[in-house]
Amino acid sequence: ETGEGIITQYIILPGIQFFYNDFHMSNGQNQNKLPHADVLELNHCREGRFECRFANGTYQYIGSGDLAINLLSNQTVSTSFPLSHYHGISITIDLQKADSVIRKIDEMTGGLDIDLFSIANGFCKNGTCAVIRNQNKINHIFSELYCTKPYMHASYLKVKVLELLLYLGTEKIQNTQVKVPYFAHTQVKKVKEIQKYMVSNLRQHYTLE
């Protein structure tokens, strides 16, 4: 064991799950042993840094203020926290199940206009992952989620998740997305070896040459 972690789960609506993630450890665990191409995952990092290794040997990272959006179509091998702590929120959406619920809400409210499949296609074409970095509106939505009182969770989380989905469905925000590069295993291994060497030789002066 490398520390401790707490995941607090809430069922927002049928097909939509919400998680508060609080970790004080360096190594996480694989949470996606099998790919789920019809599940959309949103990950917002409040503090720390998150590393994810996929079965094809590539890595992806998110840091403070990042919102990662991806379909669970890639098999995850391992996860870790390079800074030994991580605090954030995850939202998983089963597109088929949640879509029917969203449509019913749309009928009752008269024009909610949330298209989950359009959001998934807009951000995750060809199974890629997208990250929105430090976007004020998104950070504002999540800042309120982090401060929600426990007695308000049952209703307030529903409202804020719907607000987030409504915002992500706009063409403007989809055009600001930043594609996250995948890092090869050899690149990551080399960087980690350099980091390990530098930490073990703190008295030595290093340059970028």
Please tell me what each predicted stretch does.
Residues 53, 62-184, 191:
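Alpha-helical bundle regulatory/interaction domains
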Residues 166-174, 193, 197-209:
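Basic/polar phosphate-binding segments, predominantly the helix-turn-helix DNA-binding elements
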